[in-house]
């Protein structure tokens, strides 16, 4: 009985899941750098694939260079733990009207070792994880703003 009441309450408030399978008509413009290519590909996959420049919504993203901070040190002073942080600012437009203008940041920690190959692999993995976090944050905000726009 409780489940039925909950179902009726959710249905009456016009609940609509954010990722309900609807394809969103968003063109994601090119983003500078290799990390930008990865971010653009990840965003395009969230929006149902690549869209043409004449799509209803246009998303312009600017991705800053990664910032690396030391987080842990050995007694000898060598760094053993680092954090990489990426920040992306974006503007979502419906034609010429700006409907969202914000920035998102994401960070990931990784082990920094003395071996160059292992250290580079850890760094690259942390950057990729950070890009996917940014993609999740930006796509969630964009889809929410689009749904608000279409419900007005």
Model-derived segments and spans:
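Sec-dependent bacterial lipoprotein signal peptides
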Residues: 1-13
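Bacterial Sec signal peptide processing site at the extreme N-terminus
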Residues: 12-29
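Compositionally biased, intrinsically disordered linkers/stalks adjacent to structured regions
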Residues: 13, 26, 123-152
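Flexible, low-complexity charged segments
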Residues: 14-19, 34-38, 150-152
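Short hydrophobic beta-strand segments
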Residues: 25-32, 58-60
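N-terminal targeting signals for Sec/Tat export/insertion, comprising classic cleavable signal peptides
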Residues: 31-46
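Surface-exposed short loop/turn segments
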Residues: 45-46, 50-55, 60-103, 109-132, ...
């Amino acid at each position: 009985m409780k489940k039925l009441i909950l179902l009726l309450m959710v249905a009456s408030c016009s609940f609509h899941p954010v990722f309900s399978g609807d394809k969103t008509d968003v063109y994601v413009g090119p983003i500078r750098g290799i990390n930008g290519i990865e971010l653009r590909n990840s965003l395009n996959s969230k929006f149902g694939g690549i869209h043409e420049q004449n799509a209803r919504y246009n998303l312009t993203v600017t991705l800053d260079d990664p910032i690396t901070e030391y987080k842990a040190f050995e007694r000898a002073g060598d760094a053993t733990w680092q954090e990489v942080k990426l920040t992306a600012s974006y503007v979502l437009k419906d034609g010429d009207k700006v409907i969202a203008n914000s920035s998102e940041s994401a960070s990931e920690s990784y082990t920094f070792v003395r071996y160059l190959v292992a250290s580079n692999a850890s760094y690259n993995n942390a950057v990729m994880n950070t890009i996917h976090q940014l993609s999740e944050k930006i796509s969630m905000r964009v889809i929410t703003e689009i749904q608000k726009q279409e419900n007005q």
